[in-house]
């Protein structure tokens, strides 16, 4: 309550008007404003009565005003989002879940319809539980902490490619005012997992002095996404170990080949051996 009148004392909530001639009148204007967003609707708790006392030395009178708080409908849905799932390199399905809160942000009790669109997840054979259409009834207003909580769960199949993403949506609508609606998205994304395996066409070979011997190394990308594999050799430098290439970019489930070559030193004797020589392969996950 406030007033622009010069007689108004804001601290005392009082106006001292002074002398008014008999038969005259004095217009005193006050402004009544609603502060904050938690005031309950008059249709829910009734109107607020504001009383003013008017007095001089001998007569006391009261003036009453009735303040009406209009209905206000609003909704807030919380708990949605995307979750990363790391089961692309396993045979284990993985379950993700969300704790969902539907809050009445209005100023009177309200019902809310909750509907789900699960077409995307269902088409990908990702099963969902807890996503049943429903009506939440008589949810208390914001000032009384009206909230309805539930859980939704989705199963992500194993062995999927990196970046695979599916999900569903939820729409919450106020019954009191259908223009008050909110849609939330729920999804899961399969993250990139890495793995490689190696085979070689032979582990021993022979060659004349000054000649070379080739070993074909096959690398399989066992991860669920494209991987750039780097190679490194180890072996006696006199036998000049070398590789046909230093890296290969390999799609998931595919193979890449690199040729490892050892050259017999020209001055080698018939019994000369290279000793242990190795090829190391490093997935890009190794940094």
What are these regions (language model features)?
Residues 1-287:
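Long beta-sheet-rich domains in secretory-pathway and surface-associated proteins
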């Amino acid at each position: 309550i406030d007033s622009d009148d010069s007689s108004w004392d804001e601290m005392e909530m009082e106006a001292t008007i002074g002398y008014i001639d008999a038969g005259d009148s004095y217009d005193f204007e006050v402004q009544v404003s609603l502060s904050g967003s938690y005031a309950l609707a008059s249709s829910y708790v009734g109107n607020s009565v504001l009383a003013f006392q008017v007095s001089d030395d001998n007569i006391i009178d009261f003036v009453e005003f009735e303040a009406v708080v209009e209905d206000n409908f609003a909704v807030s849905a919380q708990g949605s989002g995307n979750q990363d799932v790391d089961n692309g390199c396993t045979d284990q399905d993985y379950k993700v879940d969300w704790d969902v809160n539907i809050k009445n942000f209005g100023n009177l009790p309200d019902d809310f319809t909750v509907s789900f669109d699960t077409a995307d997840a269902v088409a990908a054979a990702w099963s969902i539980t807890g996503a049943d259409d429903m009506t939440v009834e008589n949810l208390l207003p914001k000032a009384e902490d009206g909230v309805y909580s539930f859980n939704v769960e989705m199963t992500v199949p194993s062995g999927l490619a990196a970046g695979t993403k599916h999900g569903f949506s939820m729409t919450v609508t106020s019954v009191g005012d259908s223009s008050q609606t909110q849609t939330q998205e729920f999804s899961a994304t399969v993250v990139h997992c890495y793995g490689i395996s190696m085979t070689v066409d032979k582990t021993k070979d022979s060659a004349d002095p000054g000649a070379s011997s080739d070993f074909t190394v096959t690398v399989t990308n066992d991860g669920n996404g494209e991987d750039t594999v780097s190679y490194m050799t180890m072996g006696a430098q006199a036998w000049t170990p070398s590789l046909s290439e230093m890296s290969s970019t390999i799609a998931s489930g595919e193979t890449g080949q690199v040729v490892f070559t050892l050259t017999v030193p020209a001055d080698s004797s018939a019994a000369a051996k290279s000793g242990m020589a190795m090829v190391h392969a490093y997935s890009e996950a190794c940094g």
